[in-house]
Structures are given as C-alpha cells and as structure tokens.
A protein has these predicted regions:
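N-terminal intrinsically disordered, low-complexity, charge/repeat-rich segments that act as generic
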Residues: 1-122
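A short beta-strand signature
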Residues: 87-89, 93-95, 101, 188, ...
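Short N-terminal edge-element motif at the start of the domain
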Residues: 126-207
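Intrinsically disordered, low-complexity, charged/polar segments
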Residues: 213-231
C-alpha cells in the first residue's frame, strides 16, 4: 500500500501532526520511525493490506539503541520487532483489509477505548480505492462538534472500573449515535469464586470476559431513560 496520511488527514483522525524538524528512519518490514531529537514519537507500519499509525515515547542513545524504562532493563537495538514491543500510548489509527475482514478504526492505547470503527456501520472498504473514498468523506463531513469530541477522547485518562452484574453501558455505533447494553455475568468472578462446575469453554477465556446483552436501541445521545431499555 503506497500511502501515508498527510497532516490534514491526521487532524480529523486525532493523530499528532508530523513536524518539519522530526527525522525519520525506515526499517525493514515496511516501518517508518519518527524521531523528535532522540525520542521516538510516532510509528507508521504499512503493507499491501494494512496501515497503522501510532504514538510512542521512547528514548534512543547515541548508538541508536532504545533505552530501557527501568534500571533493570537493557538497551535494545532499533528494529521492527523491538519497536513493536514498545509501550504504545495515545491515539492510533488502523486500516486493514484481508479476505475475512476490512475496517478502519480510531482508538486510544492509553485508555484502551475505541472512538470509531467502520465495523459498527458494516462499511465495506475492502479495496484501497474504497478506503480513500471513505477517508475523503470522513474528512469532508468532519464538524467542529466531531473535532471537540475527538479531542476529548484523545485527552481522556484510563480508569479502573468495578464492573457489576446488572450494570448498563453505552457505546458508539457511528459518529453521531450510541448503542446500549447490560452486563449479565462477570465470568472472571465466577471463575475466581469457583462457581463454574463444568468447563463449557469458559475457563479458557482470556482477559476479563463478560457475558452481555445488547439492546435494539440507537440514540443520538448517550443519556437515556433506563426504563426505555427495559421495555
């Protein structure tokens, strides 16, 4: 994929602009590393089927080695794999098209949240031409309200949430509408309390799995009377 976002496109995707004083290093496996003095601040990964742009904050020394975050760590040679293993921060953008999946997504590595994904709207962008058309429309229709919401999302901090069964939650289904759901089971708690008698595949789930239900309700505001969902 012979394509790199420009700064005007980055603005409507929440990404940091590339500055004129930054230097670039091209690594194997189609990766571009951007340096602000001695700090890696941005990375672009690209291939025939994928484009990803994300932020880092990693310092390199005079020999071009990535310095460790702690005294126990060791400097790492600047390479495709070492950059990929670095702790990603802030906003990222990803476009991927393969035989079984195609999507564009704006997310936040710091908060582990998604601002927008074409998957929610089932938009087909399985070719670069369709992706370019989608990006053009996204940029053309990007409003001041969208910019404010994206900046708010960009500056959010991560919160630990004590999830309880019966909790309601809200999620974006597109740029202007929200969907709603409810937590039915906290599977992690069931495993911890040893309340799962059979296996049923639940013991193999990774992360913090939840059983949820999604309501057939879309609303332009995340604020909704819960009685409407319970009907």
């Amino acid at each position: 994929m012979n394509f790199i976002l420009n700064n005007e496109q980055r603005k409507v995707l929440g990404l940091e602009s590339v500055q004129e004083n930054w230097t670039t290093i091209n690594l194997k496996n189609q990766m571009i590393v951007f340096l602000d003095n001695k700090t890696i601040v941005k990375v672009i990964e690209y291939s025939e089927t994928e484009y990803t742009e994300y932020q880092l904050s990693e310092i390199i020394d005079e020999d071009g080695l990535i310095l460790p975050k702690t005294n126990k760590g060791k400097p790492k040679k600047l390479s495709y794999s070492s950059v990929q293993s670095c702790h990603k921060i802030g906003i990222y953008f990803k476009y991927e098209t393969k035989a079984w999946v195609n999507y564009a997504m704006i997310g936040n590595h710091t908060t582990q949240k998604t601002f927008y994904s074409t998957n929610f709207e089932e938009i087909n962008i399985d070719t670069f031409e369709k992706f370019s058309a989608w990006l053009h429309e996204w940029q053309k229709n990007f409003s001041e309200k969208d910019f404010f919401e994206l900046e708010t999302f960009k500056n959010e901090t991560r919160h630990n949430i004590d999830i309880k069964e019966g909790d309601f939650f809200v999620f974006k289904v597109d740029k202007t509408n929200f969907g709603f759901g409810r937590v039915l089971l906290n599977i992690r708690k069931l495993k911890k309390d040893k309340n799962i008698i059979g296996h049923y595949g639940l013991l193999s789930l990774m992360g913090q799995p939840l059983a949820i239900k999604i309501y057939h309700k879309i609303n332009p505001s995340k604020n909704i009377n819960l009685s409407e969902l319970k009907q």
